[in-house]
């Protein structure tokens, strides 16, 4: 009985959340709408990231897949920590969720580019492992 009640509550909660969800309207410059749009932008970037990741794992052997999985998990941890740090000043404010979403979107889009470049590497191209690096920009 308890299990059925809990399931019913979850279904009602999901339905209520879906009914309250708003779509992005870029002509509305209220903070609430900017937060919604930034969240949708991040969701789109995350979908592109998942596709780029899947494309790369499909081309890797077992060891490559394992190493990519470890790298991706570490990158996600870094991304989340970096965005938490870089948006800490706005914590508690109405703009905070937008800033977090924008940070997540920016870093996620950068990662999509990295994964896409790695998926297009030719075997033996040692410079392809780190796309976009310019040796002239090395930190001294």
Language-model segment annotations:
Residues 19-140:
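N-terminal alpha-helical modules
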């Amino acid at each position: 009985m308890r299990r059925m009640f809990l399931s019913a509550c979850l279904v009602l909660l999901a339905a209520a959340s879906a009914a309250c969800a708003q779509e992005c309207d870029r002509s509305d410059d209220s903070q609430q709408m900017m937060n919604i749009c930034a969240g949708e932008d991040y969701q789109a970037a995350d979908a592109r990231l998942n596709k780029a990741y899947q494309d790369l794992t499909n081309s890797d052997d077992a060891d490559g897949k394992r190493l990519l999985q470890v790298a991706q998990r570490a990158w996600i941890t870094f991304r989340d920590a970096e965005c938490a740090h870089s948006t800490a000043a706005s914590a508690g404010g109405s703009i905070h969720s937008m800033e977090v979403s924008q940070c997540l979107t920016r870093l996620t889009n950068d990662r999509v580019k990295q994964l896409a470049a790695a998926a297009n590497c030719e075997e033996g191209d040692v410079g392809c492992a780190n796309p976009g690096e310019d040796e002239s920009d090395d930190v001294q």
